[in-house]
A protein has these predicted regions:
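Soluble catalytic domains of membrane acyltransferases
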Residues: 3-8, 25-137
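N-terminal membrane topogenic signal
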Residues: 8-9, 14
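Hydrophobic alpha-helical segments of integral membrane proteins
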Residues: 14-18, 22, 80-83
Length: 137
């Protein structure tokens, strides 16, 4: 995978400490039940708030998980682009010929020990059902 915060020497330790502090001060208790090796998918649902991302990142760092995520390509434009990639982001253009499932499977099969987080709703809006492509993954 590409260069991320997870493999930036020195920075990762400070970020883990900051994430632990943020979670502790907000009353969160994180229990580690994640696998320690191999590739797997994290289903981040429901994704209904802008706080989902920073809290998810904080939990991943606290648990020492090198998590990657797929996000809408517009999140990766401008000055936010390099930051989102550095945090483990993989852009997805929903209008392109390749769909979400194909892109996810390609990323997943081309990388050993990949932890991929996705929001199956595909939006922060409240929805009655998840997008059906998620079930094929």
């Amino acid at each position: 995978m590409h260069f991320t915060i997870h493999n930036t020497p020195g920075v990762i330790h400070a970020v883990r400490l900051l994430c632990w502090l943020v979670l502790k001060l907000n009353g969160w208790k994180v229990i580690n039940v994640a696998p320690t090796h191999g590739s797997y998918l994290i289903v981040a649902a429901p994704h209904t708030s802008n706080w989902d991302f920073p809290l998810g990142i904080a939990m991943a760092f606290h648990l020492r998980l090198e998590v990657y995520f797929i996000g809408k390509h517009t999140l990766f434009k401008g000055p936010a682009g390099p930051i989102m990639r550095w945090l483990g982001g993989i852009p997805l253009n929903r209008e392109a010929s390749k769909n979400f499932v194909d892109t996810s499977i390609e990323v997943y099969t081309n990388n050993e020990n990949l932890i991929l987080a996705i929001a199956p709703e595909g939006t922060r809006d409240s929805v009655a059902r998840w997008k059906t492509g998620f079930y094929h993954m």
